Amino acid sequence: MERFKKASSIIETLKQQGHEAYFVGGSVRDLIIDRPIGDIDIATSALPEEVMAIFPRHVPVGLEHGTVIVVENGEPYEVTTFRTESEYEDFRRPSSVQFVRSLEEDLKRRDFTMNAIAMTEEGKMVDLFAGQEAIQKREIMTVGNAADRFQEDALRMMRGIRFVSTLGFSLETKTKQAIETYGHLLEHIAIERITVEFEKLLTGTYCVKALKELVETKLFSHLPYLQMSEEKLLKATQYKWDSFEADIEAWAFFLYCIGEEHPAVFLRQWKFSNKKIKDIVAVLLTIRKRKEKDWDTVLLYKTGIHIAEMAERVYEAMIESYDHTAVNRVQTLFQALPIKNRQEMNVTGNDLLNWASKKPGPWVAEMIQKIEEAIVQGNVVNEKECIREWLQECNLL
């Protein structure tokens, strides 16, 4: 409750000004579950302009949705006006938002009962939709009619299965049936938004359970490049998933599990940045080399520590060894390298031109590469004079 106490002065101030205010959303849910708490959000009957007038230190981040960030005790908190939403457009966004003075009206527009619990600054729960009961049953259940909630915003179906992965809860029967019925509406949602949810699913503690739900609800058939992948996904559930430290690792492991032969093509369908695609593919290529042999200085140097660490974690998950000292060994080997990158070489192309008295040409880059490999392999010390002597001994000058 300590973090809520730091924010309670916002609620107290709003109430002193004649408004209602409560803690709401995921932070309240996680407090009940006893999970680490993320951002703390506050809902209030005060209109956005009233919130801004009461709190001088504020940032008007989403006034059309009623949200103002209030800075209190050095921490930012989202304060959002109670609201209802009109008819939804394209199964993803409301055509308009109306501010209201009723907490119940605000809570009943939310996705799942576990996320529709409010809490006073004293810690008293306001649970109008049996959210605590759902948490006790470890069930993910929509607020009101599941068909209505998913037709309002189809992304809620992906969120539901993402919560299976992060919380280990199960989909309530009617909620699950509605996902099976309305899964096709997910095709109206921007790929980028789906990717965010799927990434959280892949990095969740209960990922295997969530992947099984994707298959059972047939929701996978409306995801990019997975339309015909039921057998592949079931194959992925046979692996023991570790909790990966980076989303790149999780994607690499997932692509390995489903046996994806064209990872770059797959990832482009999910609208990843070129940088992220490059990193995930690099991890997969490194794992392929790692399967053939253990790390040596040349492989580690060419790979770089960032990709090498991720590749080793994924490799350990693939072979189900879960040797948590393996990455430490990679780090130790990398620290022992004579140089970590080409910029640390104590020789330049100009040095070679001066020593050889030859015209510039492709030979300079080729020679730099030979010197680089020799330094990494320990065949020559990374000192200018030593490098010159080595070149002469090898008749390379």
UniProtKB/Swiss-Prot annotation:
CDD domains: NT_ClassII-CCAase. Its cofactor is Mg(2+). Disulfide bonds: none annotated. One of its GO terms (biological process) is RNA repair. One of its GO terms (molecular function) is CCA tRNA nucleotidyltransferase activity. It catalyses: a tRNA precursor + 2 CTP + ATP = a tRNA with a 3' CCA end + 3 diphosphate; a tRNA with a 3' CCA end + 2 CTP + ATP = a tRNA with a 3' CCACCA end + 3 diphosphate. Mg(2+) binds at residues 39, 41. InterPro entries: Bact_CCA-adding_enz_type3_sf, CCA-adding_enz_C, CCA-adding_enz_firmicutes, NT_sf, PolA_pol_head_dom, PolyA_RNA-bd. SUPFAM superfamilies: Nucleotidyltransferase, Poly A polymerase C-terminal region-like. ATP binds at residues 26, 29, 110, 153, 156, 159, 162. Its EC number is 2.7.7.72. Keywords: ATP-binding, Magnesium, Metal-binding, Nucleotide-binding, Nucleotidyltransferase, RNA repair, RNA-binding, Transferase, tRNA processing. It comes from the Bacteria. CTP binds at residues 26, 29, 110, 153, 156, 159, 162. Homodimer. A single active site specifically recognizes both ATP and CTP and is responsible for their addition. Belongs to the tRNA nucleotidyltransferase/poly(A) polymerase family. Bacterial CCA-adding enzyme type 3 subfamily. Catalyzes the addition and repair of the essential 3'-terminal CCA sequence in tRNAs without using a nucleic acid template. Adds these three nucleotides in the order of C, C, and A to the tRNA nucleotide-73, using CTP and ATP as substrates and producing inorganic pyrophosphate. tRNA 3'-terminal CCA addition is required both for tRNA processing and repair. Also involved in tRNA surveillance by mediating tandem CCA addition to generate a CCACCA at the 3' terminus of unstable tRNAs. While stable tRNAs receive only 3'-terminal CCA, unstable tRNAs are marked with CCACCA and rapidly degraded. NCBIfam families: PRK13299.1 (NF009814). This is CCA-adding enzyme. It comes from Bacillus cereus (strain Q1).
